[in-house]
Amino acid sequence: IERLPVDKRKLVAKNKYDSVHDELLEVGTRLLSSERLTEISLNTISDYTNVSKTTIYEHFSSSFNAFLSEVIIHVGKKIQNIYTENLSQDPSSNTLLIFRTWYEFNFTNIMLMRNIYASYILLVDTEYFPITPVLIDIEKQLKDLEFSMKNMKEIVRIFYVSVDDILGNPDVKKIDHVMKDIEPVSYTHLTLP
């Protein structure tokens, strides 16, 4: 089989595009970590990077919702990178590890998580509503345990209720209190699929 020559200019352009896109997602993460969501727009991104407004608009199809969705997924991948190396063959332990990692990240990044949570409210019922890698991984672990759809929904509900508690009460700083609430319920569900 004969290979067609690769146009190196296209490869360089693709790498440059990906590099700029990653930079914009990092800037978005920093903005969501330090500013209120209502103070952020595609225009404000240009204040924190050397990327032109035109390029920013091109990367996100002139849509602030697309920007928020991609930043949320980007943050989800960061959280996923934290726990991935510690996953085992035990889906029960993995589920609790993912929850714990998520909560610890929430506790240490309150402003970011508040803005992400507010973004979810903005994006609900739109094409931009993001499904994070964290939720995909939790769902996979629960499927490996042969959970019913009803039990999977209950675990995810508990997950979101706990996120509400964290975001609603920034004085709650002890992850162990949250995990004490979720572990018994999780184990009950995990042992009774």
List where the protein language model places each region.
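N-terminal intrinsically disordered/low-complexity leader segments
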Residues: 1-19
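A short, Lys/Arg-enriched amphipathic alpha-helix from helix-turn-helix/homeodomain DNA-binding modules
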Residues: 18-30, 76-77, 82
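Helix-turn-helix
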Residues: 23, 31-66, 70
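Amphipathic alpha-helical linker/stalk segments
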Residues: 71-98
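Amphipathic alpha-helical packing segments from all-alpha helical-bundle domains
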Residues: 80, 84, 121-168
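Secondary-structure edge/capping motif, primarily at the C-terminal ends of alpha-helices
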Residues: 86-87, 113-120, 166-173
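Helical hydrophobic small-molecule/effector-binding pocket
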Residues: 92-118, 125-130
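Conserved small/polar residues in nucleotide/adenosyl-binding loops
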Residues: 188-193
